[in-house]
Amino acid sequence: MKKAKGIAKSVAVASVIMSGSLGIQATSAFADSKGTVENLQNGGKVYNSFKTTYDMKQNIKNSIKVSFIEDPYADKKIAIVTTDGSNIDAKYTINSGYYNAGLKWPSAYHTEAEITSSDSAQFHKAAPVNTMTSAKVTSEVGYTLGGSVKVGVNDKGPNADASITGSFAWKESVSYDQVDYKTVLETHTDKKLNWKVGFQSFNFPEWGIYNRDSFNTFYGNQLFMKSRSYNEGTNNFVSKDTVPALTGYGFSPNVVAVITADKTESTSDLKITNRRISDQYNIEWVSSKWWGTNNKDTYNEFFTNNYKLDWKNHQVTLDNQKALEEQMIGINNVNNQLNKGKGKLSFSMNGDQLKATSSNAGYGISYEDENWGIFVNGEKVYTFNEKTTVGNISNDINKLNIKGPYIEIKQI
């Protein structure tokens, strides 16, 4: 590779330019679909309710279908939740450079479900379960009047069907593709579920099979390295059309959760998060050859929605008030931690916008060299140091017009 006059270094995390009134926010939209009703034999009914939201900044779509089963023979209320229609973009992003360059790529996707109300609602069953390594994962749920729920998941390759048998009053099947990734249900309790779909390996025809930990004495990790000794940095990554589809383009999770509740319940609270964990793969020109390193779990970006399950009216609705309440709990905890020096800095929410106020503006929070980050849906948008004057910090934050509802402030 020919030498250049200057050496361009890759930057893993972009900094924020603080000028004007730049807005940093979770730009989202939502859509309602009219519900449908299915009549079951012997008197039962299934009420289907849909909700779709989209976060533009993270390019994540949360879509859920809730099937409320009205069964006169069951002693519980039952809802089947699927994430059919959801999508998490890969954000396969190259950081330009000549002698140094970086690639942000998704090493794992998560779909998380949590019942946040302190009522009788609980996760009765879920699918898929255990570890799924097939290229296509198909889950099936069947319901028999009287409250019997059966779920099944394929484990026999990309063309296999989910394996539940029997006579059912109602049945549904969902699936997703995960070539070169595998599914693990990491959390499976009565109130929380967490599916992880993690990267396994990539078979690049030029060099062979590589994973996140691959190492070569001469070239380091060649995971997404196109050439060992040619190309400028920016052009020396494997294209998104060559890597696995989940790596280059994104993932469409489609999982199943069965929720039961006492007959006396009127509403329950549900939270769904779709998350993207990304590594930073860097290459550096060293001694006439490329050297690759893979930094794990560098980015944690997500999109969360709070929902209200209306058992009486068989509807799922967005619960924005719940999201703001959770937001304020976190902000109040941060305010308590920052209230320790002469310079006072505190945060509040004005609607969905983060506001900062200060007193003794010419002083810092402390004399300690401690950094804090402000994150929106997991993406860092601002950093401040405890030694910086609180007046400058609050002015910067208010100019940025940071909007939630999922804002996190934490030490970094």
Enumerate the predicted regions with their spans.
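Bacterial Sec-dependent N-terminal signal peptides
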Residues: 1-11
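Sec-dependent signal peptide cleavage junction
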Residues: 20-41
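Deployable pore-forming modules of oligomeric membrane-permeabilizing proteins
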Residues: 34-144, 183, 201-208
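Membrane-insertion modules used to breach or fuse lipid bilayers
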Residues: 131-187, 226-295
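Amphipathic, membrane-active segments
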Residues: 180-233
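Short, aromatic- and glycine-rich surface loops/edge beta-strands on solvent-exposed regions
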Residues: 266-282, 392-411
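Short beta-strand elements
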Residues: 281-333, 410
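Solvent-exposed serine/threonine-rich low-complexity stretches and specific carbohydrate-binding patches
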Residues: 378-389
